[in-house]
């Protein structure tokens, strides 16, 4: 037997979960909050905290619950096997609505072709489900149910998830101090109820991306009156990555807080890669279908047709993609407006459609067939992410006529989609200096009827290649505060190369910071509880609690250990920054102790005036006596 005749190992036999993605978070456990029925079990991560040291009062600190996107990967009671996919969450909910049917075969001709290609057997995900589709004349979107006055299990699940921090603060009655915030016209209630979720989806201010063919999904919501969400991008290219690497990026990204994942694969075996990703994803998956359609015509944009694109939409919808980026706003008349730009058209999808329009001198077929696309979307409950194909690629091009012209068209398309009860969010820039960001948010709300805004940053300056996660994180925090519903992460590799696992984590943590900062600035109920808990731990020198309450416990711990590696440093009442004699928090505590000992009341408001409260004359007499007792020598002997 020669090596040529040896059978390649099948991925369905060899694939393994990324071990780092299933490692438990320190001092944390997965908990589930049950809803009105046994199959509504909402996951959260509960961080257990240590007791406050006796010298600080000796009180028990209650655990802190945090929003958890990691799925069952961090549940030690669930056996993880990426070859089998994730447990089913939603199939019973979908079936009991009675408006779907099981297809006996895949509808896409491309899918059929791939299934009959024996050379792909080694790559195939073997446990494929038969696809669901809406029954004739039925509409299966969450928006349709919401407009019919129906509160779905998905909506109740989301209400429990979104309401977590507020409920926790209310129950504990501690650390519930929170600044009011400035919400710029958002309508954020004290309590998120299932009815509030329904009403926001019904009017189009929020979307629940939840394809009926993605039953593994843990429902989430995107909207300005909810917690700000973040998206992480993954995907192979013609030059790098494998299916296993992309699944590892997925599980790694959701571990650190990605609320959705976009698969932007442009390399080989896009169909098979996507199947593995969806079957192993507890978060919504988005794609840009024009990328795969372009691969089907060997990269020649002029050869694209509506028929090829339509088949691609159906292929991906039946796999379970939850939202599609569709660049239907790149109109023929807008393309010349980009000619004088510094960086022209930088969106890959936008440039593909611009080239097609110019080559045929015809209107964008995504625009002319938009209602046909809506028919497909509502048959599977795929949400629109209307793409900003003319977004600025440099701050010099920000807020120009091309960008805002497309945005106005996206507003028109939003209204068409809503006529079909199809869910919509709007994609936004890009590269925008800080003083021009709010104009983007205000115009989007006005033109698009408050449909959720989903932006890439924006990057606030162009001078920092290698640090664009920072340049964009600044803009992301600002636009999130102004009302943006979801922020698309940027990694340090932006403009330079494809991100690896470390880059994915750094991008996600950066954007979790931006999103949380926006929630704080908006005054989202309960958002400040985690900050308060960490601040209390910091003041009480509970180092392990500080690490564990942070977004990235591993990095915090490693930075601390670089200078204070011993276990004793984890209970020390100082850090490596100032040392034991200059720690401001230690000094403050000593001042409080002194005041308590001498009967002086120091309120939090008056702590900055503490020196005036202490009997200065008594202190001077005490020091004078100490000097005399030691022999009245200016320099003591050692």
Curated annotation (Swiss-Prot):
Comment on bound cofactor: Binds 1 [4Fe-4S] cluster per subunit. The cluster is coordinated with 3 cysteines and an exchangeable S-adenosyl-L-methionine.
- UniProt pathway annotation: Cofactor biosynthesis; thiamine diphosphate biosynthesis
Signal peptide start and end residues: none
Q: What Pfam families does UniProt report for this protein, alphabetically?
A: ThiC-associated, ThiC_Rad_SAM
Where does the chain bind Zn(2+)? 431, 495
Q: Which reaction does it catalyse?
A: 5-amino-1-(5-phospho-beta-D-ribosyl)imidazole + S-adenosyl-L-methionine = 4-amino-2-methyl-5-(phosphooxymethyl)pyrimidine + CO + 5'-deoxyadenosine + formate + L-methionine + 3 H(+)
Keyword terms: 4Fe-4S, Iron, Iron-sulfur, Lyase, Metal-binding, S-adenosyl-L-methionine, Thiamine biosynthesis, Zinc
Q: What class of enzyme is it?
A: lyase
Its required cofactor(s), as named, are:
[4Fe-4S] cluster
Instruction: Report residues binding substrate.
Output: 233, 262, 291, 327, 347-349, 388-391, 427, 454
- GO MF annotations for this entry? 4 iron, 4 sulfur cluster binding; carbon-carbon lyase activity; zinc ion binding
Name the positions where [4Fe-4S] cluster binds.
Answer: 575, 578, 583
Please name the GO terms of the biological process aspect recorded for this protein, alphabetically.
thiamine biosynthetic process; thiamine diphosphate biosynthetic process
Q: Name one GO cellular component term.
A: cytosol
Q: What is its EC number?
A: 4.1.99.17
PANTHER family assigned: PHOSPHOMETHYLPYRIMIDINE SYNTHASE, CHLOROPLASTIC, THIAMINE BIOSYNTHESIS PROTEIN THIC
Quote the subunit structure annotation.
Answer: Homodimer.
What does this protein do, in the record's words?
Answer: Catalyzes the synthesis of the hydroxymethylpyrimidine phosphate (HMP-P) moiety of thiamine from aminoimidazole ribotide (AIR) in a radical S-adenosyl-L-methionine (SAM)-dependent reaction.
Q: Per the similarity annotation, which family is this?
A: Belongs to the ThiC family.
This chain's protein is named Phosphomethylpyrimidine synthase
The organism encoding this protein is Saccharophagus degradans (strain 2-40 / ATCC 43961 / DSM 17024)
């Amino acid at each position: 037997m020669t090596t040529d005749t040896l059978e390649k190992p099948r991925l369905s036999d060899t694939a393994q979960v990324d071990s780092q993605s299933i490692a438990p978070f320190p001092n944390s456990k997965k908990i589930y909050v049950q809803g009105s029925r046994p199959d509504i079990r909402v996951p959260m991560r509960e961080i257990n905290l240590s007791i406050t040291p006796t010298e600080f009062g000796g009180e028990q600190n209650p655990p802190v619950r945090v929003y958890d996107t990691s799925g069952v990967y961090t549940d030690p009671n669930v056996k993880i096997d990426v070859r089998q996919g994730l447990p089913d969450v939603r199939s019973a909910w979908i079936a009991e609505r009675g408006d779907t049917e099981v297809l006996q075969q895949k509808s896409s001709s491309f899918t059929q072709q791939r299934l009959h290609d024996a050379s792909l057997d080694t790559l195939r995900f073997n446990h494929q489900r038969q696809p669901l589709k809406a029954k004739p004349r039925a509409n299966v979107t969450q928006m349709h149910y919401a407009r019919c006055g129906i509160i779905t299990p998905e909506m109740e699940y989301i209400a429990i998830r979104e309401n977590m921090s507020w409920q926790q603060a209310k129950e504990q009655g501690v650390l519930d101090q929170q600044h009011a915030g400035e919400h710029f016209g958002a309508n954020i209630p004290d309590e998120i109820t299932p009815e509030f979720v329904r009403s926001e989806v019904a009017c189009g201010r929020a979307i629940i991306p939840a394809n009926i063919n993605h039953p593994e999904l843990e429902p989430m919501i995107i909207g300005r009156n909810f917690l700000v969400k973040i998206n992480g991008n993954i995907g192979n290219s013609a030059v790098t990555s494998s299916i296993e690497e992309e699944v590892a990026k997925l599980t790694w990204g959701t571990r650190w807080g990605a609320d959705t994942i976009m698969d932007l694969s442009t390399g080989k075996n896009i169909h098979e890669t996507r199947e593995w990703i969806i079957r192993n994803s507890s978060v919504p998956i988005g794609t840009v279908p024009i990328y795969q359609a372009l691969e089907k015509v060997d990269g020649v944009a002029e050869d694209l047709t509506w028929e090829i694109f339509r088949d691609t939409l159906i292929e991906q919808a039946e796999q379970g993609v939850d939202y599609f980026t569709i660049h239907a706003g790149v109109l023929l008349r807008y393309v010349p407006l980009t000619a004088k730009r510094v960086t022209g058209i930088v969106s890959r999808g936008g440039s593909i459609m611009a080239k097609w329009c110019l080559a045929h001198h015809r209107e964008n077929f995504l625009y002319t067939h938009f209602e046909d696309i809506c028919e497909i979307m509502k048959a599977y409950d795929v949400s629109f992410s209307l793409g900003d194909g003319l977004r600025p690629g440099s701050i010099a091009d920000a807020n120009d006529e091309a960008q805002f012209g497309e945005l106005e068209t996206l507003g028109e398309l939003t209204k068409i989609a809503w006529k079909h009860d199809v869910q919509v969010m709007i994609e936004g820039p890009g590269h925008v200096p800080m003083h021009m960001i709010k104009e983007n948010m205000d115009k989007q709300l006005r033109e698009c009827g408050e449909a959720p805004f989903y932006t890439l940053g924006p990057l606030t300056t162009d001078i920092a290649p290698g640090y664009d996660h920072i340049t964009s994180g600044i803009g992301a925090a600002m636009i999130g505060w102004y009302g943006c519903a979801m922020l698309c992460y940027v990694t340090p590799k932006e403009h330079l190369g494809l991100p690896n696992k470390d880059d994915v984590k750094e991008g996600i943590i950066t954007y979790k910071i931006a999103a949380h900062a926006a929630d704080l600035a908006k005054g989202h109920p309960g958002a400040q509880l985690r900050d308060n808990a960490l601040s209390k731990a910091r003041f009480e020198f509970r180092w392990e609690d500080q690490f564990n309450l942070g977004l990235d416990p591993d990095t915090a711990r490693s930075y601390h250990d670089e200078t204070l590696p011993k276990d004793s440093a984890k209970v020390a009442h100082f850090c490596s920054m100032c040392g034991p004699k200059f720690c401001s928090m230690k000094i403050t505590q000593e001042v409080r102790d002194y005041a308590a000992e001498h009967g002086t009341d120091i309120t939090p408001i008056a702590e900055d005036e503490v020196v005036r409260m202490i009997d200065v004359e008594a202190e001077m007499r005490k020091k004078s006596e100490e000097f005399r007792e030691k022999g009245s020598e200016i320099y003591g002997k050692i």
